[in-house]
């Protein structure tokens, strides 16, 4: 039995249309809370043995074809407010990164690094997302969250274990809001900078394709577009190129011809196609260079049951 909710609770909901790659099986349950109080009540009443998986907009995610044996929690409109208080930008976890960057810039506050990061604020914090030399950790003050037990908490950034493309958030903890410190800037200049970032991204990344952003972490731990990485040799895309894997395919999955560290659904791909191609790239890059790439895309869920 699931606890009563004011939001939406759906059994056996396919997750494929909720991910950017458009693949994956169903969740046992999908819960979309109306607001924080609804989330607190639900988690507090939910059997502690039931796994919980917080999901953003699915921009950095492969859900395997067998689906997810968990309650997937996806925040919606009740969690996407953005407000400015002095040098602080407070954003709901469901607010899109790009919207937060634009809203802050309009108010003369600089969070422009978020403009080209796909996804929502909750995912950006969880992954310590970064671009153009800035990371969430450089600006984050604190987050609000609800623990797996249904307890609202405020956690300072220093307690989140933020590192390259990762954090140490407790399992099942659902982020609901993040507070950033943002430097002052001229709104027009900030807007121009974001336009330049978008143009640079669109000229080098397959933004018109179904992808989940960068597939593998850069081995040295630098952002693929960060200033510190512009002179660094160990870039994932370069290692993939040197292994002859630009454009490599498996089923409907492909390593992009435009940017070889982007795994795309070129049409009709399954999660198995995408993950299988990624694992093949890891294997062949290691054979070629002796360097083992690490996934940046999160992969979750079960393999499909063989019905033969």
Swiss-Prot record:
Residue numbers spanned by region Disordered: 197-228
InterPro entries associated with the record: FAD-bd_PCMH, FAD-bd_PCMH-like_sf, FAD-bd_PCMH_sub1, FAD-bd_PCMH_sub2, MurB, MurB_C, MurB_C_sf, Oxid_FAD_bind_N
Reactions this protein catalyses: UDP-N-acetyl-alpha-D-muramate + NADP(+) = UDP-N-acetyl-3-O-(1-carboxyvinyl)-alpha-D-glucosamine + NADPH + H(+)
An example Gene Ontology CC term for this record: cytosol
Biased composition (Polar residues): 212-226
Main localisation: cytoplasm
Protein name: UDP-N-acetylenolpyruvoylglucosamine reductase
Biological source species: Cereibacter sphaeroides (strain ATCC 17023 / DSM 158 / JCM 6121 / CCUG 31486 / LMG 2827 / NBRC 12203 / NCIMB 8253 / ATH 2.4.1.)
